[in-house]
Structures are given as C-alpha cells and as structure tokens.
Amino acid sequence: MTRSGFLRAMEEILDVPARSLREQDSRETVAQWTSLADVQIFSLITSEFGVEPDGELIEAESVEDLVRVLQSRGAFHD
C-alpha cells in the first residue's frame, strides 16, 4: 500500500470526505476518530503492512505520527 492509499483508507475508516484528512489531524480534531476507529486502523495496519500494533503505534496521536512510524518501518511502497 502506498502512503496516499493509507490516507484514503483512513478517510474511509474515519468517515471523512475524500482528500480532507491532513497530516496534523488527530483524535482531537476528527470527531469520528474513536477507540473503535483505532481498532479498525490497527487492523488495517496489521493486514496491509504486517505490522503488529506496539507502544509506538498505540501512542501515535496524529496522522503524521502514524505515517512517520510506518515509514520508519519501510511499510509504504510506491
């Protein structure tokens, strides 16, 4: 999955308009980013990237944090 594909998948999970999710968005700025959405996001990360949620991912507070962690693990491909 590409980085942009991950962002599109997050938009679907969070039920926000396409291309509206910004890297600075977080649980604080997206009302739909609930604990249930967290479970869906972590499920996506596990199924698409084979990355199990750990402390670093669980502590990620924004889209930017999630992207940074996934990039550091070489998860995205173009």
What spans do the regions from the language model cover?
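Phosphopantetheine-dependent thiolation modules in NRPS/PKS and related acyl-activating systems
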Residues: 1-78
